[in-house]
């Protein structure tokens, strides 16, 4: 009798489809991206307030994202065997510690490494949040709700960031991040301890061979490297074209606000349009949006480009993660997909930094566009194999 009671309690604790778990994941996931979601403004803040070069500023955010990527690799390999509550609590404390240390040593040589440490904590939080949101029965809806919250924060964060930095400087911003991460420990109580295979059943799942799963992961990696490159340099692209900082911030605010509409559109259209159509439109449209920024765009063209990029990014991401989840019956694929996502977002700035030559961003933008196209082609390969298996069932 006691064993049955314990089993019932265990099942309640790992119900990833329950609203307490979903809401906690959405809130904690937003805490995990406090820095990343306003990264273009952070880059400009480093240039203006730490007096570093454009390339060094991009490199600094790249180090933070490298920490995120390392954490998600760790999580993909061993993290799912550890109590999720312990992981999230540790991630919050590491992120808070890294942010606080960064605030106290913003001009020190070790600043970049402190950002990497903060990024490692952020990556632990992000990995768990994305993993159990992504494996829920209504993955597209839940990922989209996640995006709505973090984009709402990002929109206002980018809009007000120049003013905030003028008042409290970079160090003050990191103190705020540390405080929010500490407060978020309250939400750990609502995080499930793990997940069970029973919660992973989805009618569209077909198990693909390992080689095709690897191709799918390479597609996710290429797509997110492109996103990481673009997101790191957007502010610099605008200012290098002669647009003032506040006008660039306004354009990015508008793009974040409209990206909320993109995420909501994925909720409303998830069951109304073919997933493959949504993915094609999102990825190829993202490439076209970056193409609008080639050369020296004016305010209108810059605004159109960044808005298109951000809307489509947040529209297509739930569809991509939903598609990836359909390739693997065990549900473990989602952990690796999140790792590839974070490696790409972290590697993007590191790839972009040496391509910035002080003369413009054309090379960076062309590499970004090429990676979008490569990701689309790669994702089609396992998608077609999945379609054949689904038709034969």
Regions inferred by a protein language model and the residue ranges of each:
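Structural signature of the two symmetry-related core transmembrane helices
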Residues: 86-100, 277-292, 366-369
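A late C-terminal transmembrane helix in Major Facilitator Superfamily
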Residues: 327-361, 368
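Extracytoplasmic gate region of multi-pass secondary transporters
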Residues: 40, 212-253, 257
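Cytoplasmic helix-loop-helix junction between adjacent transmembrane helices
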Residues: 114-149
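Helix-loop-helix hairpin linking two adjacent transmembrane segments in secondary transporters
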Residues: 136-139, 144-193
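Conserved MFS/SLC helix-loop-helix module at the cytosolic interface between two early adjacent transmembrane helices
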Residues: 70-107
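C-terminal transmembrane helical hairpin of 12-TM major facilitator-type secondary transporters
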Residues: 273-320
